[in-house]
């Protein structure tokens, strides 16, 4: 059994599928690796009508796979070092779902930008032993509706000023001709309407409430955000229907060769997870224990290399 391409969907539909656990992550997937700049560039690309690479989903029908393999939810609140692991999800008794084989980084980035937060450490402060919001404050994605980015100081050809900001950051930036920060996730709370005129009406209502109804860039940008997230079917995807875990693993390895390179530890974890259902959880638990209880900063790579060495297998530094 092979697969097929399905009709493209909106970003809003994909976000709903993630929230309702219709999209899950298989244990062969690696961690979320994108940084804040990559997420902002993705949103700018969507706003500029740039194509988003196709997704690949695995429709999981086999009861044996549903019950014998671990699946995970998407990250909502990412915290550097302390909130990087996806929550495990029990699929027993769960309805239909698909596992994301290719496109995890993009979907997670969109989900965090629209429904979650991203926490990184403040500069010039020591790393805490546990998650401390005063040191790693949650940041939400905002879009500056007041003005575009300055092309003379913008090597990436970005147009839209997306930034992850804390509540304190937003409070410090008063609304003026250069600052009108809109929380991107709020676009999902706008009324669902069909006609273009109705969309513009709601955009003007919002801008009028913040004293920016006469700003043409703000009107065009907020309208563009609505269309990009809620109206345009920009996410193309392929559905793999095979229930052969070996075939799915091979597809995962091949499709990920073109994106962020798979590290040897990523590949080894994927292979292990295909036959040891909670390998990922056990390794992550050990990493967290060594970090929090013993005070050493290590990552999954070191643990995986140590495991290979202890089995007397060939290992490269």
Residue ranges with predicted function:
Residues 2-33, 38-314:
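Basic- and aromatic-enriched surface patches that contact anionic nucleotides/nucleic acids
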């Amino acid at each position: 059994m092979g697969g097929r391409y399905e009709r493209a969907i909106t970003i809003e539909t994909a976000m709903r599928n993630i929230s309702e656990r219709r999209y899950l992550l298989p244990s062969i997937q690696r961690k979320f690796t994108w940084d804040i700049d990559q997420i902002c560039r993705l949103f700018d690309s969507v706003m500029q009508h740039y194509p988003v690479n196709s997704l690949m989903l695995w429709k999981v029908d086999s009861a044996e796979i549903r019950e014998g393999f671990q699946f995970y939810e998407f990250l909502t609140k990412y915290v550097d070092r302390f909130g990087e692991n996806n929550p495990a999800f029990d699929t027993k008794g769960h309805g239909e779902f698909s596992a994301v084989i290719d496109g995890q980084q993009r979907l997670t980035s969109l989900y965090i930008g629209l429904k979650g937060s991203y926490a990184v450490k403040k500069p010039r402060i020591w790393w805490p032993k546990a998650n401390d919001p005063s040191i790693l404050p949650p940041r939400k994605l905002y879009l500056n509706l007041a003005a575009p980015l300055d092309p003379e100081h913008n090597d990436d050809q970005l147009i839209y000023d997306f930034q992850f900001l804390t509540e304190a950051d937003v409070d410090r930036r008063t609304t003026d001709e250069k600052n009108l920060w809109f929380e991107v996730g709020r676009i999902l709370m706008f009324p669902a309407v069909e006609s273009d005129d109705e969309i513009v009406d709601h955009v003007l209502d919002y801008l009028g409430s913040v004293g920016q109804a006469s700003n043409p860039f703000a009107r065009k940008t907020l309208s563009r955000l609505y269309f990009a997230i809620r109206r345009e079917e920009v996410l193309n995807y392929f559905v793999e229907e095979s229930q052969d875990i070996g075939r799915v693993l091979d597809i995962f390895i091949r499709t990920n060769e073109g994106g962020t390179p798979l590290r040897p530890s990523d590949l080894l974890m994927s292979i292990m997870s295909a036959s040891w259902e909670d390998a990922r959880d056990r390794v992550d638990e050990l990493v967290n224990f060594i970090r929090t209880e013993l005070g050493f900063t290590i990552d999954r790579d070191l643990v995986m290399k140590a495991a290979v060495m202890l089995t007397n297998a060939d290992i490269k530094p």
